[in-house]
Design a protein with these regions (language model features):
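Conserved beta-strand positions in the central sheet of alpha/beta enzyme cores
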Residues: 28-31, 98-99, 129
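Short beta-strand/loop segments at the ligand-binding rim of alpha/beta enzyme cores
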Residues: 51, 93-98
Length: 228
């Protein structure tokens, strides 16, 4: 899920409190090319004693703008690098690499050729998102079918940019902690699920605000990071 540290509309406190209200045990905060929101959320949980695990991560922009999730990595990763280098770097830092909204044409996403190329090279891509309630997640069923051959851990993610969408998709796993979730990924013991209730409707003004952050603010922040 995303916070105001990239193109989400909820700040870390709002994201944490909404996740708890939704009954989630663990969340992964994955702002675009930034771990600041995730670190802030985890610090808040520790300070306030909230009953929630926070996985620090980011949604990394690789070559050609393709996105990849890096979980359990507490530093910002270089942008626009080849996928193979990014996956190897994530592993070297002790993290796990996951393919979000695979096969989607609505946002730069890992395609079949990229995923199978990484696996052919023996690179440690660990999981693939098979449930994502956003429009970008529509190819999820096809990804689930292809994953019978890939053998990756499946996971569900809300990809929430709006607070009401938190928990719209989730991952079942044995245990209740971030460490349990990681072990389940490694054991291919995760199950992707979508919430029973329909996806919450978002007011047009909020879509406009989020689009502005996504199309103007977030790219400007990325440009500053690249030029530093």
């Amino acid at each position: 899920m995303h916070t105001t540290y990239s193109d989400g509309l909820g700040n870390p406190r709002e994201v944490v409190e909404t996740a708890i209200a939704r009954g989630l045990d663990v969340i992964a905060v994955t702002d675009h090319d930034s771990v600041a929101g995730a670190l802030a959320a985890r610090e808040l949980v520790h300070k306030e004693g909230y009953p929630l695990g926070v996985i620090v991560g980011s949604e990394v922009t690789m070559a050609r703008g393709v996105h990849l999730l890096a979980l359990f990595v507490e530093e910002r990763l270089p942008m626009f690098e080849p996928a193979a280098r990014t996956v190897a770097r994530i592993a070297a830092l002790g993290g796990v690499a996951l393919a979000p909204h695979p096969l989607s044409r609505l946002t730069p996403s890992p395609g079949r050729r990229l995923i199978e190329g990484l696996l052919a090279e023996g690179l440690p891509l660990l999981g693939v998102e098979t449930v994502n309630p956003s429009p970008a997640g529509r190819p999820g069923e096809r990804a689930r079918s292809l994953n019978k051959g890939w053998g990756l851990a499946e996971f569900g993610g809300s990809d929430a940019h709006f607070l009401p969408h938190i928990g719209a998709a989730y991952t079942l796993f044995p245990g209740r902690s971030a460490a349990d979730f990681r072990r389940a990924l490694e054991a291919r013991a995760t199950v992707a699920r979508r919430a029973d209730e329909p996806l919450a409707r978002i007011p047009l003004r909020d879509y406009a605000r989020q689009s502005g952050r996504s199309m103007i603010l977030n790219p400007a922040q990325k440009l500053l990071r690249v030029n530093r």
